[in-house]
Amino acid sequence: MSYRKAASARRDKAKTRSAGLTEEQKQEIREAFDLFDTDGSGTIDAKELKVAMRALGFEPKKEEIKKMIADIDKDGSGTIDFEEFLQMMTAKMGERDSREEIMKAFRLFDDDETGKISFKNLKRVAKELGENMTDEELQEMIDEADRDGDGEVNEEEFFRIMKKTSLF
């Protein structure tokens, strides 16, 4: 591989790591990182990561933080530099955006605003979309998504089933 191709490949890789973020989002991520890099070392640790993510509007669980650090902290230093943080938050921002899209779709189904998608809601949407589905097929869809067994699909169940389909 020529030097030019190698340099171009490196630039493309760097671009895709934070691709899809606006300059404003990148700046927001940089500010959160800098705020918690109190000693100016260019790195933050696990505790600081949790606080920085909260500042960006996420509520990470302890297990999620541990997994994120393990995935990113390849040298085992227990710290994350800005590039690693940017990469991680780019993925998180994408998740946040797709979650918002999925919740918009949920609200289209939940026209009676109960916080759940009922058989009646699903039947109405299928009819509006011109889908010729039997009641049995519609009930199977509800049953597939319904994890708590209440006969309806709540936001979390809807989110989970939509993520499974890879549409979002």
UniProtKB/Swiss-Prot annotation:
**What's the domain of life for this entry?**
Eukaryota
Q: Which GO terms describe its molecular function?
A: calcium ion binding
SUPFAM superfamilies registered for this protein in UniProt: EF-hand (SSF47473)
Residue stretches making up the EF-hand domain: 24-59, 60-95, 97-132, 133-168
User: What Pfam families does its record include?
Assistant: EF-hand_7
Q: Which GO terms describe its cellular component?
A: myosin II complex
Residues reported in the UniProt entry to bind Ca(2+) 1:
D37, D39, S41, T43, E48
Coiled-coil stretches noted in the UniProt entry, renumbered to this chain: none
Do the record's keywords include Calcium?
A: yes
Mind listing the GO biological process terms from this record?
Answer: cell division
Q: Which UniProt keywords apply?
A: Calcium, Cell cycle, Cell division, Metal-binding, Mitosis, Repeat
Give the matching CDD domains.
Answer: EFh
Disordered: region residues? 1-25
Q: Where does Ca(2+) 2 bind?
A: D73, D75, S77, T79, E84
Residue positions annotated to bind Ca(2+) 3 are D146, D148, D150, E152, E157
Keyword field contains Protein transport: no
State the family it belongs to: Belongs to the centrin family.
* Role: This calcium-binding protein is found in the basal body complexes (the functional homolog of the centrosome in animal cell). In mitotic cells it is specifically associated with the poles of the mitotic spindles at the sites of the duplicated basal body complexes.
Protein name (database record): Caltractin
Which source organism? Scherffelia dubia
